[in-house]
């Protein structure tokens, strides 16, 4: 007999939470973290009288759902929450409740949260939760910057002249004080210079970049990732024409102050290979791993070697060039370290004509203002620790950018202004952190349950096979024995324990 739906209307008393699967991502997020702290963060932006507003926690959760599931349009986000029961439950709305209009997002953002650091505080609170769960330890970190294009027409690009305040001190305060104590340092008065830049009439705060294949206007996203579970611990946004090496030290220092995070090792890319960055990392108590740049005026190309114990260069004739003073490079506004030969030794040297200009009295070398730290940093290149950190940087730093751009609405910046761009980047990083937080915690809980259920009733060999099967991306039968042994070595290690201490199998 063929069945057919009657279509009869029925009354049903239903708890919406019962419809959400136990393994749903939003249910796991709701179990792990409570967002009630947002009420205290935004309390000062709401008056004590008048009509009740939309719940700020529900408002934030709705935005978070959009970034978790790659829903960039706020109009479409409202439609999805209206239809999806899991989204409704996570945002705190029952089946019969009306979802706020899409214009509520923009009105709340402009009237209440636009000039605040609410999203930054929420991001930091989530990171603190990860630290409490021991998902972040600071032992191995990776930092990098990435260009995020702005959603503007190329026809809106214009060249404008702006006045920029030029100062020769732009790193850490401790590093600036250290430079100020050296001979030859003179603090110049800050002055403004006229500079021609490319920007967009649509978004005046974005910057222009032309580096290799990257060309356009947008923003520079600077992030730091903990390599233990890939939790993003720091997010800063700048115009795309800013230089990464000038921003990284204060970016890391801010995380140490706000999170109380003790960083031990940080992996960076080649663009951060400057003496100031190497020395700044040392002052922050961080061991830096940075690929070395082969500079065209490297003294080693001309047969000079550096003695780190005496802080001197040794010329091919065996004479020492000692540190003399700091010299200011007026074209770049930075200080250089001047090393030179003492006395009139160069006048009698047979290699004088090929060593330096005959108009000079002695051989000089201009190096980075923090060359000793620069040299120490280069000694770590190609060591086993360096190669290990470079692999971690590719996985977590570059991988996090790829994931946020592909899955969490960060392929472009579609809002206007650096504050709105920062909001987008923070929400994308929060979505990534929550997913990785859930994966790390619930994977550990699941593995603990397997061990607890099988430790007594199953032999160790069979237990290890179960764990091996769960840790491999494909069943063990579909991969080679050699690949399986490299992927998971615990069964071989414990086979000797099973032989020495056999366990009886329950029958």
Q: What does each of the following model-derived ranges do?
A:
Residues 2-5, 70-83, 93-507:
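Anion-binding and metal-coordination hotspots
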Residues 17-19, 51, 213:
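Short secondary-structure boundary/capping segments within folded domains
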Residues 14, 60-64, 106-107:
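Positions in alpha-helical segments
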Residues 58, 64-68, 72-75:
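Glycine-rich, N-terminal phosphate-binding loop and its surrounding beta-alpha-beta segment
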Residues 22-64:
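Basic, short loop/linker segments at the boundary and entry of helix-turn-helix/winged-helix-like folds
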Residues 40-46, 88-95:
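Short amphipathic helix-turn modules centered on a small-residue break
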Residues 1-27:
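Hydrophobic alpha-helical membrane-insertion signals
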Residues 37, 67-70, 85-89:
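Short alpha-helix boundary/capping elements
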